[in-house]
């Protein structure tokens, strides 16, 4: 089965779309958090509706795994959004999809909808993305980002409708388009070897992401262990990793939000494993903003190993 077919089958489950402010519904990764425009820090805070994570080399995935998760986003303790994330990992391919919606007070101020997806192959244990799409809509406009990749190289990317040229953005070079992953794939941390998935060393890594607009690096470091508990599903230990952001290109250097996030030393992500794999994903994330902490946390986190396909006889 092709990755695109896997994604299509995966998203035919009963996950109801909801509405979320355009800036809050981009798929998982810090890149979306950094795309702060004229809406200022309120939009930056709402971007807690997306995930953080890292990407590191890994051995072959030893089994198949699946995640069905529901998240709530808050800003300064006030509920602003809800979202869903689904991941399927088989022995030779993977697919992931996310969607979200505004809740509580945010419905009175801003409405929108958004979804994102990524698919690719599992090659030597590494998730190699082949395609990524993110669509966001509000009452005023809609936007779709598409990225095509092969072997960690961006082969094509587009934003529809095409944004006007901005000479203030640092140009993205061909070198910046190599050795990267898309934001959705970048939300899954792969752990090499056969050792403990929940060791401090797992946090000590870095990754390079291109989100269609911006190329940036994320560096992670170990902070502590905590126990977490979802209303449904996972309860157990989580790795809490510090997250440090370095923009590379595709950004406006004098933007206040970019400078703020570059200086941040208190961004954190809580990582937990998907059974049957050596993949960890975010259970919770926290991003300080001048309006208070932007927090995304799982309320449902149902992850399980899935059976291998039966081997065919001779």
Show which residues each predicted segment covers.
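Cleavable N-terminal signal peptides
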Residues: 50-51, 61
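Positively charged n-region of N-terminal signal peptides that target proteins for export
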Residues: 1-3
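Bacterial N-terminal signal peptides that target proteins for export
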Residues: 5-6, 13-18, 23-48
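Internal, conserved structured core segments that host functional sites
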Residues: 137, 141-183
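Acidic, serine/threonine-rich low-complexity disordered tracts
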Residues: 63-151, 196-314
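A structural motif
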Residues: 179-196
């Amino acid at each position: 089965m092709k990755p695109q077919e896997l994604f299509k089958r995966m998203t035919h489950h009963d996950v109801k779309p909801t509405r979320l402010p355009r800036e809050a519904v981009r798929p998982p990764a810090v890149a979306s958090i950094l795309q702060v425009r004229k809406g200022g820090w309120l939009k930056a805070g709402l971007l807690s509706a997306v995930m953080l994570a890292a990407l590191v080399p890994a051995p072959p995935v030893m089994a198949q795994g699946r995640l069905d998760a529901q998240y709530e986003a808050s800003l300064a303790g006030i509920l602003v959004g809800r979202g869903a994330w689904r991941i399927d990992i088989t022995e030779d391919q993977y697919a992931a999809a996310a969607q979200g919606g505004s809740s509580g007070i945010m419905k009175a101020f801003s409405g929108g909808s958004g979804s994102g997806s990524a698919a690719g192959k599992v090659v030597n244990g590494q998730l190699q993305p082949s395609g990524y799409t993110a669509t966001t809509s509000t009452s005023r406009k809609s936007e779709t980002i598409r990225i095509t990749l092969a072997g960690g190289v961006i082969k094509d990317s587009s934003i529809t409708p095409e944004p006007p040229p901005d000479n203030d953005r640092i140009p993205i070079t061909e070198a910046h388009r190599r050795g990267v992953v898309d934001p959705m794939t970048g939300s899954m941390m792969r752990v090499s070897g056969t050792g403990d998935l929940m060791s401090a060393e797992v946090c000590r890594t870095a990754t390079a992401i291109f989100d269609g607009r911006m190329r940036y690096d994320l560096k992670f470091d170990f902070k502590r262990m905590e126990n977490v508990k979802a209303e449904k599903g996972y309860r157990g230990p989580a790795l809490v990793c510090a997250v440090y952001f370095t923009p590379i290109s595709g950004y406006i250097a004098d933007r206040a939000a970019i400078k703020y996030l570059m200086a941040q030393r208190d961004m954190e992500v809580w990582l937990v494993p998907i059974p049957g794999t050596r993949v960890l994903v975010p259970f919770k994330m926290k991003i300080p903003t001048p309006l208070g902490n932007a927090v995304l946390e799982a309320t449902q986190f149902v992850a399980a190993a899935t059976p291998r396909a039966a081997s065919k006889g001779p």
